[in-house]
Amino acid sequence: MAQWKNLAFLQKEVFFESRAMEEWLIEMRRSIHRIPEPGNKEQKTSSFICKMLEEMDIPHRSYGTAVVGLIEGKEPGRCVALRADMDALPLEEPSDRPYASLHHGYMHACGHDAHM
C-alpha cells in the first residue's frame, strides 16, 4: 500500500513540476516542430537537442544524428532508457500557425516533436 502512496506523491510532483515548466515545454516543442527533417538527416534537430541538453547540464554524446543523454540517479540500482524518434514525414504541413514547418515538404505529423 505504501508504494501506491509514493506513486500518487510522484504523480503530483510531476504534475506540478510540468505546470511550472509549461510555457518552456510548449516553446521547445514548437521549436522542434518548425524544423522537421527526414530520417538520418536530422542535423538541425540533433543540434537543437544537444543545445537543450547543454543548457540543462546533462552530459551527452552525438553519434551522427543520434543523441544520447545520460541522467544518473542518486542511488545505485535499476535504470531506465528513454528513446525518442526525431524524423519527420514527407508531407506538406497545411498550417498558418507561427510554429508551422519551415522545411518545405516535411512535417512532424506523428507526434515526434512531443517525444523529444
Predicted regions and their residues:
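Acidic/His- and Gly-rich active-site-bordering loop/insert found
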Residues: 4-108
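DPxDG-like acidic metal-binding loop motif
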Residues: 116
